[in-house]
Amino acid sequence: MKSVKKLLLLAFAVCLAVGFSGCLEQPKIEVVGQKIQKVDADNTKIEIQVLVDNPNPIGISIDKISFDIYALVGGDKIYLGHGEQSNIKITSGNTTFTLPVTISNKKLVEVALKEKSTKIPIEIKGDIAVNLFITKVNIPIDIQQEIDVSAIAKEEVLNQLNNLNPNQIQSIAQ
């Protein structure tokens, strides 16, 4: 999870750095939490909590953050998932918002098996639509990084174990 967290933090930091480049100080961005919302046979849905500390007297409106996540395996790009959020208002001071991300479990397992590792090189491509009051600007996102997906698997196994009732535990033990 920390790698995914760092990756999303990096993507958002690039966005805000460009958006606030004319201001006195660059806002500080921090991922303050993440939670696996839902895991099913097909997808894992994660919510990333982002805190922006904007020391500037003015805020900014992000109309939309939208990005796709690809695994980079043997020269190929394999689609893993998508993240998107709209209407984010960054005010002066502290602002917190959530970035929902959906990842394909089938593709994630496929890539991990091909790589023979839980550490997967990925690329995030997308756009950030920023409303600068006078005009709107689309800022491209193109980030390459390695993530460790073992945390997703570990958290889901623990969740499943915690949800077992005594009868299920007894039948497993036999």
From Swiss-Prot:
Its main location: membrane. Pfam families: LEA_2. Keywords: Membrane, Transmembrane, Transmembrane helix. The keyword Ligase does not apply. It is a single-pass membrane protein. One of its GO terms (biological process) is response to desiccation. One of its GO terms (cellular component) is membrane. This is Uncharacterized protein MJ1138. It comes from Methanocaldococcus jannaschii (strain ATCC 43067 / DSM 2661 / JAL-1 / JCM 10045 / NBRC 100440).
